[in-house]
From Swiss-Prot:
<dbReference type="InterPro" id="IPR005227">
    <property type="entry name" value="YqgF"/>
</dbReference>
<dbReference type="Pfam" id="PF03652">
    <property type="entry name" value="RuvX"/>
</dbReference>
<comment type="function">
    <text>Could be a nuclease involved in processing of the 5'-end of pre-16S rRNA.</text>
</comment>
<dbReference type="InterPro" id="IPR037027">
    <property type="entry name" value="YqgF/RNaseH-like_dom_sf"/>
</dbReference>
<dbReference type="InterPro" id="IPR006641">
    <property type="entry name" value="YqgF/RNaseH-like_dom"/>
</dbReference>
<dbReference type="GO" id="GO:0000967">
    <property type="term" value="P:rRNA 5'-end processing"/>
</dbReference>
<keyword id="KW-0378">Hydrolase</keyword>
<keyword id="KW-0963">Cytoplasm</keyword>
<dbReference type="InterPro" id="IPR012337">
    <property type="entry name" value="RNaseH-like_sf"/>
</dbReference>
<comment type="similarity">
    <text>Belongs to the YqgF nuclease family.</text>
</comment>
<dbReference type="GO" id="GO:0005829">
    <property type="term" value="C:cytosol"/>
</dbReference>
<dbReference type="GO" id="GO:0004518">
    <property type="term" value="F:nuclease activity"/>
</dbReference>
<keyword id="KW-0540">Nuclease</keyword>
<keyword id="KW-0690">Ribosome biogenesis</keyword>
<protein>
    <recommendedName>
        <fullName>Putative pre-16S rRNA nuclease</fullName>
        <ecNumber>3.1.-.-</ecNumber>
    </recommendedName>
</protein>
């Protein structure tokens, strides 16, 4: 086991990506993947898996603030199931509430409005999802 994990922040137009290390509990953004109505370029996902060889994948689970599911929740679950089905890697879902808000805030502090492009926000959200996963002791 390498201790490497990949995280995805699922979206219908853009999917944020982050890579992290379980040993250090740290994560960093990778370029976001464009999606068409939630469907990514699966060849790109396959390349990421071959390059990073993660022990597991974390997919952010979008929930309402009260913990109930929203329309995007089922699509994120389907995305996670497809990754597992196509590539056989272990996939876990992790609550992503407020990750996008936190990502926007952090990027804005670093570079104002210029830093707020969609791909950067989505991958920064994936970092937050993965760091939150580590913080919860997984």
């Amino acid at each position: 086991m390498s201790g490497t994990l990949l995280a995805f922040d699922f979206g219908t137009k853009s999917i944020g990506v982050a890579v992290g290390q379980r040993i250090t509990g740290t994560a960093r953004p990778l370029p976001a993947i464009k999606a068409q109505d939630g469907t990514p370029d699966w060849n790109l996902i396959e390349r990421l898996l071959k390059e990073w060889q993660p022990d597991e994948i974390i997919v952010g689970l979008p929930l309402n603030m009260d913990g109930t599911e929203q329309p995007l929740t089922a699509r994120a679950r389907k995305f996670a199931n497809r990754i597992h089905g196509r590539f056989g890697v272990e996939v876990k879902l992790h609550d992503e509430r407020l990750s996008t808000v936190e990502a926007r805030s952090g990027l804005f502090e670093q570079g104002g409005y210029r830093a707020l492009n969609k791909g950067k926000i989505d991958s920064a959200s994936a970092v937050i999802i993965l760091e939150s996963y580590f913080e919860q002791g997984y």
